[in-house]
Amino acid sequence: MALKQYKPVTPSRRYMTTSDFSELSKVEPEKSLLEPLKKTGGRNHYGRVTMRHRGGGHKRKYRIIDFKRDKINIPAKVASIEYDPNRSARIALLVYADGEKRYILSPKGLHVGETVMSGAKAEIKVGNSLPLENIPLGTLVHNIEFEPGRGGKIAKSAGTYAQLMAKEGKYALLKMPSGELRRVRLSCMATIGVVGNEEHSNEVYGKAGKTRWLGRRPKVRGMVQNPVDHPMGGGEGRSKGHIPKSPWGTPAKGYKTRRGKKQSDKFIVRRRVK
């Protein structure tokens, strides 16, 4: 994957960069793995805004992704690499030996025509999914389970990965994308390799309209709002002296918002880097 740059024929094009989509197959999505996706506009079932700055955007269909990789010891051939509007990563269509089709996250280096497999006996190869106890130390992995059989939860965005650092008793020690060191059960599944589309974070949208296509609405700074709407609002002209806060009054810089006692604290060996 590479980034495509544009000639500055308009101000918005000057710094715009997009993916060249060269790694994608020229095929239509698999219909049996599509579902309707209703837009919420950031509202919950009461109609109240629970996620600000969401709304509009292009119509999408949801691609059903296999995060569990639970077809054990059945080889699958990569039929296509496809775009998914619902995530930053690309997805790969697998056709299993028994005829079933499934989408998975496409790791970097996976190509059409290759064969992948899940299970303890699978070889250490990009795209294969194995329990952590069968993966060598130092291997980069993604789509990692927190609980056996519940499906991958960690390292699923474009370009992300975790590194297997050690094995202690029933647990593996993983270095997370954030830098946190965390224990995960050795029986949890993980997929070999780094999630593809690693240049995604370097893309520049160039204009406000492109973010609107993605369903993002404008963010208004708290300082320019009224006192009734934001703790930092009001004042004559530009006023200072406020501690930076969220719209709900929580300090915005350096204030710890993680709950004091969480059940999962015992699995964290080293906290993430600030």
Swiss-Prot record:
PANTHER family: LARGE RIBOSOMAL SUBUNIT PROTEIN UL2M, RIBOSOMAL PROTEIN L2
Region named Disordered: 223-274
Domain of life: Bacteria
SMART domains in UniProt: Ribosomal_L2, Ribosomal_L2_C
Gene3D superfamilies: 2.30.30.30, Nucleic acid-binding proteins, Ribosomal protein L2, domain 3
SUPFAM superfamilies: Nucleic acid-binding proteins (SSF50249), Translation proteins SH3-like domain (SSF50104)
Family label: Belongs to the universal ribosomal protein uL2 family.
Keyword Ion transport: no
Name assigned to this protein: Large ribosomal subunit protein uL2
Gene Ontology terms describing biological process: cytoplasmic translation
GO MF terms, alphabetically ordered: rRNA binding; structural constituent of ribosome; transferase activity
Main function: One of the primary rRNA binding proteins. Required for association of the 30S and 50S subunits to form the 70S ribosome, for tRNA binding and peptide bond formation. It has been suggested to have peptidyltransferase activity; this is somewhat controversial. Makes several contacts with the 16S rRNA in the 70S ribosome.
Gene: rplB
